[in-house]
């Protein structure tokens, strides 16, 4: 769309950036309403099997994966081999495949499929974070299995299993300290409450 997206800690922060663009850099920008950057996550462990099969005349598609998805903390005490774990950007992938149930060359495609699925969200299409996946079994077909089949199986598998894993919407939360004269205390508390603020003391 040719848009440039600016991000900040709140509306005031964004207004200051836009003001500086106009004042210091002489950039006249059409600015839309700010959007809150939500995220999604899951809150429960779920085991799932995804069997991806397609037959269309010639060579078909086949991939079979069995995995467990859970919040990353669920795997904190994982006692398997550490070299089977890869972790980045709020996503943990544990490969427990042994004995060639899924050939080694297809494992990166499974991981890639899960990572791509995280970008599309579960409930509201916001990026998903804090998710761990433990791939523990599966099968393949000598002719019909390929990298794309396993990538698609992972995408579909995440979508189908995440719905059962108690998905939750996350929103940005900030901790602030407010100092105000006593006569304005009621107004300030009312304003904070209207914005779903939680007053601690």
Task: Annotate each predicted stretch with a short phrase.
Residues 1-201:
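Accessory interaction regions appended to the cores of large information-processing enzymes
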């Amino acid at each position: 769309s040719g848009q440039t997206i600016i991000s900040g800690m709140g509306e005031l922060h964004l207004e200051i950036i836009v003001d500086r663009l106009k004042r210091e850099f002489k950039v006249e920008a059409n600015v839309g309403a700010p959007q809150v950057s939500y995220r999604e996550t899951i809150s429960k462990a779920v085991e799932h099997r995804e069997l991806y099969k397609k037959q269309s005349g010639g060579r078909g598609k086949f991939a079979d994966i069995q995995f467990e998805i859970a919040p990353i903390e669920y795997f904190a005490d994982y006692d398997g081999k550490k070299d089977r774990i890869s972790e980045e950007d709020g996503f943990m992938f544990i490969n427990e495949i042994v004995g060639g149930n899924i050939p080694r060359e297809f494992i990166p495609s499974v991981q890639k499929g899960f990572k791509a699925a995280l970008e599309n969200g579960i409930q509201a299409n916001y990026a998903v974070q804090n998710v761990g996946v433990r791939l523990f079994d599966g099968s393949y077909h000598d002719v019909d299995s390929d990298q794309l089949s396993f990538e698609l199986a992972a995408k579909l598998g995440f979508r189908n299993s995440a719905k059962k894993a108690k998905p939750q919407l996350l929103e940005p939360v900030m901790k602030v300290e407010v100092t105000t004269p006593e006569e304005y205390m009621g107004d300030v508390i009312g304003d904070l409450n209207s914005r779903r603020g939680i007053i601690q003391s």
